[in-house]
Amino acid sequence: MFARLVPRLQPQLLSKRVLTARYPMLTTTPIYHQTPMQIIKRNYVIVHRERKKEPVIRYLFYMLVASWVAIYFVANRVDKKKPPQQSFTEREFQSYEEETGLKRRNKLISHTMNSKYKFYVIPYVHDEEELKKVANLLQHKDENATVKIIDPAQLIEEQKKDEGMKYHYLLEDLDEQGRPYPPGLITAVIKQEIYKILNTREGTFDTNFIIKNYPQTTNEAIKFENDISDIQKCLILHYDMLNELPKNKTNEEQRAIKNVDGYFNSVGKSKTLVEKFDPMDKEFEEIMLEDI
């Protein structure tokens, strides 16, 4: 019987020997036959347990919703605490013009029309009698042209009173909010008035325009020459600038108006009229000779 079992057990015994020879770790060695390193390896085997997979997508979704809610409430609080805007930038004014169809196009009066329409600006004038005297002297020196005085302050008031005017609602909003007029707004109102004049019978004549109390910033001066026409002369009334300007304007406004004089003086377009010491009539004689 034992002889019969030997052939059957021989392959199993042989395979066991081969495995033992190839992989000695598979055999069980008594502890008293093991080396210290084998004992340490046996006691410090790391067993990797399967971790439960957390719902990552659901977690991220909740975090995203929570962040949106937090941003919403923070933004609302910031808007409520944000102080009212105290200025109206040129970019905001341009956006307003684009939205309302009032965007500026090319220069209103081309260079070929400069001999027909001339513009004289007075950055600051306090005495209306002096303004009339300037207009009369200009009319006397250039009898072939009419003289038209433009008062930007009066044009602004007309815009406020008439709801049909282009800038009525903008001016109304700015006044209600106590915000200053944006750079370019006064120039835009003046441009509208000049455009209206040019499209009437009055616009068919050669005209010398006098714009009072304008420009009072170099920004407005540049915009006028970019959007409307070249400025012939900037007339500085010496007495009003010296005596009346400090009484009626803040230091910042005075500085801005004086900068206008400096700007036109740098390009040779500024003329100071000193009536008491140098007759104004003589000054206009020089202006007319320069224009010819």
From Swiss-Prot:
<feature type="transit peptide" description="Mitochondrion">
    <location>
        <begin position="1"/>
        <end position="26"/>
    </location>
</feature>
<keyword id="KW-0809">Transit peptide</keyword>
<comment type="similarity">
    <text>Belongs to the AIM36 family.</text>
</comment>
<dbReference type="InterPro" id="IPR027417">
    <property type="entry name" value="P-loop_NTPase"/>
</dbReference>
<keyword id="KW-0812">Transmembrane</keyword>
<protein>
    <recommendedName>
        <fullName>Altered inheritance of mitochondria protein 36, mitochondrial</fullName>
    </recommendedName>
</protein>
<feature type="transmembrane region" description="Helical">
    <location>
        <begin position="56"/>
        <end position="75"/>
    </location>
</feature>
<keyword id="KW-1133">Transmembrane helix</keyword>
<keyword id="KW-0472">Membrane</keyword>
<dbReference type="GO" id="GO:0031966">
    <property type="term" value="C:mitochondrial membrane"/>
</dbReference>
<keyword id="KW-0496">Mitochondrion</keyword>
